[in-house]
Amino acid sequence: MENEMKHSNDALHVVMFPFFAFGHISPFVQLANKLSSYGVKVSFFTASGNASRVKSMLNSAPTTHIVPLTLPHVEGLPPGAESTAELTPASAELLKVALDLMQPQIKTLLSHLKPHFVLFDFAQEWLPKMANGLGIKTVYYSVVVALSTAFLTCPARVLEPKKYPSLEDMKKPPLGFPQTSVTSVRTFEARDFLYVFKSFHNGPTLYDRIQSGLRGCSAILAKTCSQMEGPYIKYVEAQFNKPVFLIGPVVPDPPSGKLEEKWATWLNKFEGGTVIYCSFGSETFLTDDQVKELALGLEQTGLPFFLVLNFPANVDVSAELNRALPEGFLERVKDKGIIHSGWVQQQNILAHSSVGCYVCHAGFSSVIEALVNDCQVVMLPQKGDQILNAKLVSGDMEAGVEINRRDEDGYFGKEDIKEAVEKVMVDVEKDPGKLIRENQKKWKEFLLNKDIQSKYIGNLVNEMTAMAKVSTT
């Protein structure tokens, strides 16, 4: 089947254009690799400063090419900063300003390349109109779960132009929202969601960017499946009156290379499935109080743990740890606890037989990695779509547990950490722990089913081929 697809779709040409954040670039790369295996020609747009890293992530294929983009000068944007990884959240907003100034450059490239489709991201609200004028179809590729789009950015959220919702409005789902486990959100979560309606540097709000993109595109592509999010997918389809193509949740390839020896040696000391691995992504910095309560909560489980903490650039990590961690903590846990700052081989660690639990920020890719590696998922979401990921996984999928937090400000204590971990690691013979562990195994089996994965990509290629009216003869 795949060989037939390869032969028949040689002519299909797709431009992929993610926002300049690796949390967005990575899903675009994963999809590019899948499409190239079906013989689809891919031109990958990214800032020149990101090109070498993107190249290392893309599979080598004669039909895949990187197109480096030149970022214009923007007051306040440091020279050479071409992804959110090098910027604070406030300065990262300037990347959207830069992107908006790149429209002439993008139009020239698209006029020259003449692809059948552009797969674009949330920030390029102007792209559908531009591409349409050039006779090019556009697909809005949503890298967040469908629940996030359904709850936050559907037209039903703003029923009158520019009359944005209040804090109380954001606690409730929008009009017509399907009946699911998500019936409300907490005050601190709703407050975080209000970011969607803020304007930065006199630019469009995130909500308005997403609306323009979704309303203007030819079709919507979602990194999800009906088994996980059926009601939300139907709601999004009805709200925008557009076809929604699905590619299923993207399961990462098994890690290449061996786990660093010092970590492998340490993990090998413990019984299978007993170690807690804990990390919150590269762009999350916990407060001193959060570090303290998290560390004490992990200690109180009595289980071995590997805690990865991130700190802003140019700070003294040792000094930060000494200030944030309780006095005597490192000495107390030296035999069964590791506190590390910096990059680690996360996939390799989750795949290690000793690791049985992942305490995380509920980034959906991280959750998928945990589920397929037989790790129980304990979630402490930090912002935005992570909050809704956690509700999907703990509520609709019943495949993880969310750490309890105070409604007003999101405070959590060591007891909340301990209680959540023990549900899935200690009290495993009674619900909810028993049910969650059973569901983890079911979702693992589903996610690793290669026939299902291939079917989604094959269907997408067929749909795009039909839309583009590419000759398959």
Curated annotation (Swiss-Prot):
Domain of life: Eukaryota
Tissue: Expressed in petals, styles and anthers.
CDD domains with a match to the protein in the record: GT1_Gtf-like
Stored PROSITE patterns: UDPGT
GO aspect biological process, one term: anthocyanin-containing compound biosynthetic process
Protein task: Controls the rhamnosylation of reddish anthocyanidin-3-O-glucosides, which is the first step in a series of modifications that finally yield magenta or blue/purple coloured anthocyanins. Controls the conversion of anthocyanidin-3-O-glucosides to anthocyanidin-3-O-rutinosides.
Protein name: Anthocyanidin-3-O-glucoside rhamnosyltransferase
Organism from which the protein derives: Petunia hybrida
